[in-house]
């Protein structure tokens, strides 16, 4: 099992012959159900599914269910971050772990693009989403020279699985690839917890009080993009 971002892995094995017995599996951050399992909770998700299937409201349990969902959005599904939260129950310390992960990703982005364009595009995801524009506006992040020959950089970013691309399509039916416009896209961080940390990247660390306010839904910051 090879761990790390796919950028590092591909760089490290690019000259190694891959045996035919190798089976490649894609690993993703924990989803909400897996996160609840890590929290020792195997009952909530089946219960939510029952209510959804029956199309009935949660009632008094809704507030706790939303708080648990916000906790997942803040911690995210990266195993190191989840372990830190389980060990410390401290969102600020968990944030420090997520910052280390993001720093590794930024280092990897600089490996594939030494001009720093990939890293800059990644760092600008929160601000671009906050503009509520129809697509990622590369022109507001990179100058004219930086926007030249960008398709290869974007392809490497997509292959890294650190970011997710959502492409515009005029006819989003079967055969989506026939109608998608790869010049018209939005870019998202692949993990909600990393997105929250990246949104507060201007601070040396995200204070525990900020996390607590986000968790209790009392901070004015728009959580819509985390959803």
Residue ranges and their predicted role:
Residues 1:
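Conserved Walker B catalytic segment
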């Amino acid at each position: 099992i090879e761990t790390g971002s796919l950028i590092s892995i591909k760089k490290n094995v690019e000259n190694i012959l891959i045996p035919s017995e190798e089976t490649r599996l894609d690993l993703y951050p924990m989803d909400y159900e897996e996160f609840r399992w890590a929290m020792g909770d195997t009952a909530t998700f089946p219960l939510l599914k029952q209510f959804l299937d029956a199309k009935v409201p949660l009632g008094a349990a809704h507030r706790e269910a939303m708080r648990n969902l916000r906790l997942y959005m803040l911690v995210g599904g990266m195993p190191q971050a989840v372990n830190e939260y389980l060990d410390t129950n401290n969102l600020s310390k968990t944030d420090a772990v997520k910052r280390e992960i993001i720093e590794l990703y930024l280092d990897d982005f600089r490996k594939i693009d030494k001009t720093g364009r990939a890293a800059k595009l990644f760092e600008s995801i929160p601000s671009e989403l906050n503009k509520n524009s129809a697509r990622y506006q590369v022109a507001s992040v990179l100058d004219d020279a930086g926007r030249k020959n960008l398709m290869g950089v974007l392809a490497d970013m997509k292959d890294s699985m650190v970011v997710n691309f959502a492409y515009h399509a005029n006819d989003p039916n079967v055969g989506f690839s026939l109608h998608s416009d790869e010049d018209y896209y939005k870019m998202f961080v692949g993990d909600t917890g990393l997105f929250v940390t990246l949104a507060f990247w201007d601070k040396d660390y995200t204070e525990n009080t900020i996390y607590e306010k986000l968790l209790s839904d009392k901070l004015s910051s728009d959580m819509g993009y985390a959803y």
